[in-house]
């Protein structure tokens, strides 16, 4: 059987960098990527058969865990009828109805193929609806790889050591205003000065691409207020937080209603999908009923819709979320205790089923500057140590971790015991 080095070398001959998304290449942590063969429940298995407790969960979608039998059955049933038709299907409406019934203030939703498509389309819609060009985002927040949003982006763009990407025209960058996440006064000052130029604010309600940074009290409410006063739109990028902080996402959790919401990940049950939605008044600006154009050959793919619909049906069950939230909290508390026993500066943030760990002496991490000051070298050693112990974390210190309903108390104990060993070795 080929080792990882051989498989990676082969991949690099035909795939740029050997991967189809940069963070997978392990550039941030060093070494060569683990190649996965299959997954089930809370575990992924590499091509050599080694099992890992998985806290990446395909970067968030697998809230039910990998290979949920009911989701797989729903997918198989759709597969027997064909893969794609390029025509409307009834299941698109069923999933749309389900999402609109769940998400506050969402009357209509448009399906696309990825989170990037969702945010890109939401920005275009906001500009078309308001007749304004400028958009506001926050330093370290990642909203996909469309040109307008790769300005001081988080996630993979941070691990590459650059705040944006070559190939983004300066004229687009000029229309993107970047502020500090969790800085309310900075937002208010901008809107006092230039509010009538701004089409929208786009924000991750919980920033999950500079690790896991929850909003400070009042921050999201302040965004809602300034947008309302300036007739700008507030976009919540809930590609990551959607259905992970509860059934109604971050907007339900924090009781702040955006004008447009972008979704992805969980709504496809692991299949490629994205969506954006809002009030009927705003969404009717989208073609074919409105002037703002958006289209996609594979949008609303029936197989992806089947996976998403079954996933949402299952997570809508009463009492579904609390056990996951409890396990997330227990994991974070116990990791902090293990680090303290080892004399290592380490703190965690968690909200719902999202979590993150920071190697720092600070007690609280709440913005991009603090994240960038954390000890990434120590994280890299921790990552590889945990990998050796059979725990799969995101291969970059700027990524959130995730919990699923499939993770057991034994998995949490296994993870914490592994961390104790690793903490002792990286002092």
Swiss-Prot record:
PROSITE patterns on file: AA_TRANSFER_CLASS_3
Record-level GO cellular component terms: cytoplasm
Keyword Isomerase found: yes
Cited InterPro entries: 4pyrrol_synth_GluAld_NH2Trfase, Aminotrans_3, Aminotrans_3_PPA_site, PyrdxlP-dep_Trfase, PyrdxlP-dep_Trfase_major, PyrdxlP-dep_Trfase_small
Transmembrane residue ranges: none
Subunit structure: Homodimer.
Name of the molecule in the record: Glutamate-1-semialdehyde 2,1-aminomutase
UniProt organism field: Teredinibacter turnerae (strain ATCC 39867 / T7901)
Organism classification: Bacteria, Pseudomonadati, Pseudomonadota, Gammaproteobacteria, Cellvibrionales
Gene this chain is encoded by: hemL
């Amino acid at each position: 059987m080929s080792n990882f080095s051989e498989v990676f070398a082969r991949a690099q001959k035909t795939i740029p960098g050997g991967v189809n998304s940069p963070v997978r290449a392990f550039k941030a942590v060093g070494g060569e990527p683990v190649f996965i063969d299959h997954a089930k429940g809370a575990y992924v298995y590499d091509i050599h058969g080694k099992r890992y407790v998985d806290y990446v969960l395909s970067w968030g979608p697998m809230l039910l865990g990998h290979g949920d039998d009911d989701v797989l059955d729903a997918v198989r049933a759709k597969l027997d009828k064909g893969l794609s038709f390029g025509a409307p299907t009834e299941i698109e409406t069923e999933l749309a109805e389900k999402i609109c019934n769940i998400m506050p203030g969402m009357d209509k939703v448009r399906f696309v193929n990825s989170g990037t498509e969702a945010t890109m389309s939401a920005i275009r819609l906001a500009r078309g609806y308001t007749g304004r060009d400028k958009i506001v985002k926050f330093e370290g927040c990642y909203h996909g790889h469309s040109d307008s949003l790769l300005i001081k982006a988080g996630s993979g763009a941070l691990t590459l050591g650059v705040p944006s990407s070559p190939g983004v025209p300066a004229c687009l960058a000029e229309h993107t205003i970047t502020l500090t996440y969790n800085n309310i006064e900075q937002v208010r000052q901008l809107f006092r000065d230039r509010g009538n130029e701004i089409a929208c604010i786009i924000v991750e309600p919980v920033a999950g691409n500079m690790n896991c940074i929850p909003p400070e009290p009042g921050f999201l409410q302040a965004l809602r207020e300034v947008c309302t006063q300036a007739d700008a739109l507030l976009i919540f990028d809930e590609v990551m937080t959607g259905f992970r902080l509860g059934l109604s996402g971050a907007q339900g959790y924090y009781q702040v209603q955006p004008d447009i919401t972008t979704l992805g990940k969980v709504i496809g049950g692991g299949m490629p999908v994205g969506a954006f939605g809002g009030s009927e008044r705003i969404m009717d600006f989208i073609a074919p009923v409105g002037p703002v154009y958006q289209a996609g050959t594979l949008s609303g793919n029936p197989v992806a819709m089947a996976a998403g619909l079954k996933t949402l049906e299952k997570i809508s069950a009463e009492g579904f979320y609390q056990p996951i939230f409890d396990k997330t909290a227990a994991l974070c508390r116990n990791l902090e205790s293990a680090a303290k026993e080892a004399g290592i500066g380490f703190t965690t943030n968690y909200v719902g089923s999202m979590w993150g760990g920071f190697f720092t002496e600070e007690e609280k991490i709440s913005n991009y500057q603090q994240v960038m000051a954390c000890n990434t070298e120590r994280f890299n050693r921790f990552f590889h140590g945990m990998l050796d112990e059979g725990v799969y974390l995101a291969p970059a210190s700027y990524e959130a971790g995730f919990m699923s309903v499939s993770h057991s108390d034994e998995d949490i104990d296994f993870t914490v015991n592994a961390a104790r060993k690793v903490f002792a070795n990286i002092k």
